[in-house]
Amino acid sequence: MKQLTVLFIMINFFLSAQEKESDEIAAAASNATNPLAFVTKLQLQPNHTWKDNDASQINITTRIVQPTGTLGLPFIKSKDPSKVYTIYRLEVPVISQTFPNATQFDATGISDIVLLDVVAFKQKWGLVGIGTGLIMPTASPKILGTGKWSSGVSGVVLNTKIKGLQYGVLFQQYWSFAGDADRQDKNFMLIQPILNKVIAKGVVLAFSPIMNFDWENDDFYIPISLGITKVFAKNLSMSLTPEYVVSGPTEGDFTVRFQINAMFPPSKN
């Protein structure tokens, strides 16, 4: 009888541990693909784009995502950080491009740094975020950037009510306001539809192409993409996403995106 009791306790402990691990993996999968998750993220994202005329571009972006219990600015505290908080996102891209059969210049160096500041509001069905963005002309050599200071607005709507499914949209609109007078002014919008579906334990299928509408030149860039994210632990995920431009001046460009995403509990501030 004692042996059966011990066996029962061991089985129950094992099942509880398995259930806890499964819940942690599910939570990590949700956090990895949710742009408004209250989780600190350190991401490394190498992208390789193949263009016409044997041209190519490698873009390695380092991204830091830091949530805080504030309202837009670090010194304005949220009354209820569990429902209203701020996400700061800093992107630092390093680009290497080659154009062997074109008039554009080969170059390698840092591109423009991007900073987003989004206030997130939790809803019964998901999340809403609204904020600002700043593009800094940090490119060196200058050919790798816009040469302009640009700022604008950003917003996110994300439905997370259904377990294992996220859908919504993220947009950013920028206007240039200063910078190199010899460079063209900037007025463009980025729209990113978001559709993430858990298809297996720790595996997420993601549709999230970034469309670019260049109002200044009356152009647009429409890609299609389908990526897969694998969560290896409660604090680590990797994703692979092929992307193809189906319409616009860069039609036919093919990009492979790879991302390593490390997640940490946010600082308590």
Each language-model region and where it sits:
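Bacterial Sec-dependent N-terminal signal peptides
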Residues: 1-19
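Transmembrane beta-barrel domains of Gram-negative outer membranes and organellar outer membranes
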Residues: 19-269
